[in-house]
Curated annotation (Swiss-Prot):
Keywords: Acyltransferase, Lipid A biosynthesis, Lipid biosynthesis, Lipid metabolism, Repeat, Transferase. Belongs to the transferase hexapeptide repeat family. LpxD subfamily. GO terms for cellular component: membrane. It comes from Methylorubrum populi (strain ATCC BAA-705 / NCIMB 13946 / BJ001) (Methylobacterium populi). Homotrimer. PROSITE patterns: HEXAPEP_TRANSFERASES (PS00101). This is UDP-3-O-acylglucosamine N-acyltransferase. HAMAP family: LpxD (MF_00523). Pathway: Bacterial outer membrane biogenesis; LPS lipid A biosynthesis. InterPro entries: Hexapep, Hexapep_transf_CS, LpxD, Trimer_LpxA-like_sf, UDP_GlcNAc_AcTrfase_non-rep. It is an enzyme of class 2 (transferase). GO terms for biological process: lipid A biosynthetic process. One of its GO terms (molecular function) is N-acyltransferase activity.
Length: 351
């Protein structure tokens, strides 16, 4: 549940404003001036809270909720209790997310941990760095020579911005994150401990030893990207590593040199993408997916968690398994193996 000690909800949001934002009419008799002071799960929501429901497994909780209002899809609307106002929308979760953004504005983007305004004592900004008005720098952060940082951007404690790095406006760079050899767009969120722009893993291997290949490319991060804690993105070897507009990357992801990730991709925790692979727009990689190098995963494809991708994936595909293959083939193989294993166990007197 939300705790006002950490995140304070915005005052002044009313039931009428909620309905207007969702594009749904209020039921007859509902008071549009009623304040909405929080958001909570169905089970714990109180008489001034907003809740949502879009999964049948929570039907019992819906029937007993005490929420002021609940965002529901049309098929669940009849199950909303009499004391709760049903706000009927085709996509309750998306509507709920939008309303949370209005109610908890400060949770949308990490701010200064020390309520800094300008450069804090204890931070070090090189005289040749260029910071626009409105940049906030927490204690311990370091900004190298030639770096450029746009207005509204926040650097957390002990963040390191290397020489000549460019960061756009309204970004958030988490505590302990490091950025080198990188160009970062606007409204980018980089969470604590992320490592951006370090050497890619490149060696010319041979019997006499392994010769390091200089990594002379960059990392390009476009607008509205979010990068999770302790994720690592290596700079390119001779071309750039690119993360496309609107892409969301979870914690603990490794992206190797020369990887190109398209627009609005989703990459879940534990993924590893080997060098020179391309993800086209709107690709989704489930948790702990491994992708071999020099591949192309087509637009809109989805890869199931813990899969290993070792060949190109056509656009619009749904693949899974090790090695990854179309999900119908994967399921059929798993079912066949399960039946064979069961039959074998019975034949051996184990069934």
């Amino acid at each position: 549940m939300s705790d006002p000690v950490f995140i304070v909800p915005k005052a002044g949001l009313t039931l009428g404003a909620v309905a207007e934002a969702c594009g749904v009419p209020l039921p007859e008799g509902a008071d549009p001036s009623q304040p909405v002071t929080g958001a909570a799960p169905l089970e714990t929501a109180g008489p001034s809270d907003l809740a949502y429901m879009d999964n049948a497994r929570y039907g019992d909780a819906l029937g007993t909720t005490r929420a002021l209002a609940c965002l529901v899809s049309p098929r669940f609307a009849p199950r909303v209790p009499a004391g709760t106002i049903a706000l009927v929308t085709r996509d309750p979760y998306r509507a709920y997310a939008g309303l949370l953004a209005r109610l908890y504005e400060e949770a949308m983007r990490p701010g200064s941990l020390f309520a800094a305004s300008g450069v804090s004592p204890g931070a070090h900004v090189h005289p040749q760095a260029r910071l626009e008005d409105g940049v906030r720098v927490d204690p311990g952060a370091v900004v190298g020579p030639g770096a450029e940082i746009g207005s509204g951007t926040v650097l957390g404690p002990n963040a390191v911005i290397g020489p000549n790095v460019r960061i756009g406006r309204d970004c958030s760079i988490g505590s302990g994150a490091t950025l080198t050899h990188a160009l970062v767009g606007n409204r980018v969120i980089i969470h604590p401990g992320a490592r951006i722009g370090q050497d890619g893993f490149g060696f010319a291997m041979g019997a006499g030893g392994h010769i390091k290949v200089p990594q002379v490319g960059r990392v390009i991060i476009q607008d509205d990207v979010e990068i999770g804690a302790n994720t690592t993105i290596d700079r390119g070897a001779s071309r750039d590593t690119v993360v496309g507009e609107g892409t969301k990357i979870d914690n603990l992801v490794q992206i190797a040199h020369n990887v190109v990730i398209g627009r609005h991709c989703v990459i879940v925790s534990g993924v590893g993408i080997s060098g020179s692979t391309t993800l086209e727009d709107y690709v989704v990689l489930g948790g702990q997916v491994g992708v071999v190098g020099h591949l192309r995963i087509g637009m809109g494809s989805q890869i199931a968690g813990s899969s290993n991708v070792n060949r190109d994936v056509p656009p619009g595909s749904r693949w899974g398994g090790t090695p990854a293959k179309p999900v119908r083939t994967w399921f059929r193989e798993m079912t066949t193996l399960a039946r064979l294993a069961e039959r074998g166990g019975k034949d051996d007197g184990e069934g």
